[in-house]
A protein has these predicted regions:
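Structural signature of the two symmetry-related core transmembrane helices
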Residues: 70-84, 270-285, 365
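Loop-to-transmembrane helix entry/capping segments in MFS-fold secondary transporters
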Residues: 36-37, 124-136, 238-239, 321-333
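A membrane-interface helix-boundary motif in multi-pass transporters
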Residues: 150-167, 350-368
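Intracellular juxtamembrane helix-capping segments at the cytosolic ends
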Residues: 108-123, 308-322
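Hydrophobic core of transmembrane alpha-helices in multi-pass small-molecule transporters
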Residues: 12, 93-111, 214, 294-308
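Helix-to-loop junctions at the C-terminal end of transmembrane segments
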Residues: 52-66, 152-153, 255-267, 352-353
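Helix-loop boundary and gating motifs at the non-cytosolic
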Residues: 1-47, 205-244
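Juxtamembrane intracellular "pre-TM" segments in multi-pass secondary transporters
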Residues: 1, 179-211, 215
Length: 381
């Protein structure tokens, strides 16, 4: 099997795990008796832990040697599998909250390593098409979401840990299948010239884009984590949730599979700015939607919002960073996903409990607008 095919399996397995974890966190924890505010606190707290963990793992991978991306990913995948086994044993509520939060932390920590693998193979002269592999990830996400939506509607949220267990086992298998020649350890050279300056000074546009990305993803996380409540406000249920998530994932496919061509025509920074504007339009659409059909229609905009963001953010880090900072750059961009989850889930849970769905969507729209403006500013730097 070619490296390209194996990498597609890796992305597919990862996004199935992401779907079972992040896609159905609210469905599962609501079924376990948690409030929206408590769910926000759990996801935010462990998101903070993930935000600390991601850059540290990125620096370890950047050093090369034995602690490359694959050994680190194997450890995280094995821990995730063990976590899923414990969840299936139906522990007490408090322990369940901690275990599921830890699972989300591990899933977030895996992302920069999964993305960095494609550039590792390219550096060794093995062509890997990141866009098509990420498209396979979206396709797997869509299929699992449809299946889980139907299962949770019939059997309840308690089925989610079993889905997590199956996805974690598959992902661990796919990590094991990946060939990996360890990169030579990089010598610790004394930085010279502008290398002595801080990250913010060396990469000002990148740092502004990190802020923009965090706000875009705060919007994205609010409208995903609390999508079951958004649908419930217009008469929907968990079966509609499965359809909505799957529709959004399917809408990602044209962009994911065609991104290599798109990237040849536009810079990654420009594409992130376009994604920001699409998040704004999507937010307005959510606010105007008065039915399940309206929410489903808004999901079509996933093609121009998150789909563009997911691919362009990986390329943006690759384009913006010097060679010795590339995996760290990937980790920083992945941190915006975690930081967006912390901000969106924490604020979203509190606003939803206190003010309801309408105000929640207005707050989310404000975040999207601010993120789009910052992305435009970053492009001017």
């Amino acid at each position: 099997m070619s490296v390209n095919a194996r990498y597609r399996l890796l992305q597919g397995g990862y996004w199935m795990l992401f779907c079972a974890g992040y896609g159905y966190v609210t469905v599962f924890l609501l079924a376990e008796g948690f409030s929206a505010g408590a769910i926000g606190v759990i996801t935010a707290l462990f998101g903070i832990f993930a935000a600390v963990l991601q850059p540290w793992l990125g620096r370890l991978a950047d050093r090369g040697g034995r602690l490359g991306w694959k050994p680190l990913l194997l450890v995280l995948a094995a821990l995730g599998l063990g976590d899923a086994v414990l969840l299936c044993l139906r522990p007490p509520q408090a322990v369940t909250g901690v275990l599921f939060g830890a699972l989300l932390m591990l899933i977030s920590a895996m992302m920069p390593l999964v993305n960095a693998a494609s550039f590792h193979y390219r550096s060794q002269g093995k062509p890997v098409d990141f866009g098509s592999a990420r498209g396979v990830g979206s396709l797997c996400y869509a299929v699992l979401s449809l299946v889980l939506g139907q299962l949770t509607a019939r059997l309840g949220g308690g089925i989610v840990p079993l889905a997590v267990l199956g996805a974690a086992a598959l992902f661990l298998l796919f990590v094991l299948l990946m060939p990996c020649k360890p990169a030579p350890a990089k010598p610790k050279a004394e930085p010279k010239g502008d290398k002595r300056r801080g990250f913010l000074v060396r990469y000002p546009a990148f740092c502004v884009m990190l802020g923009a990305s965090t706000l875009m993803l705060a919007f994205h996380n609010i409208t995903n984590t609390y999508l079951i409540q958004i649908l419930g406000a217009v008469g929907g249920d968990s079966a509609d949730l499965g359809v909505a998530i799957a529709l959004a994932a399917v809408m990602e496919l044209p962009v994911m599979f065609g991104f290599s061509r798109i990237a040849r025509r536009w810079s990654a920074g420009s594409l992130l700015t376009i994604a920001g504007m699409a998040f704004v339009v999507k937010g307005v659409w959510y606010l105007m939607a008065g039915s399940v059909r309206g929410i489903l229609t808004a999901q079509i905009l996933q093609m121009f919002s998150f789909a563009l963001f997911a691919s362009a953010s990986v390329y943006y880090a690759e384009e913006s960073m010097e060679e010795q900072d590339k995996v760290t750059g990937q980790a920083c961009m992945s941190c915006t996903i975690t930081a967006g989850a912390v901000l969106g889930n924490l604020v979203g849970g509190w606003v939803l409990d206190a003010c309801g769905v309408g105000i929640l969507l207005a707050v989310a729209l404000g975040m999207a607008v601010t993120g789009a403006v910052l992305a435009g500013v970053s492009e001017k730097l």
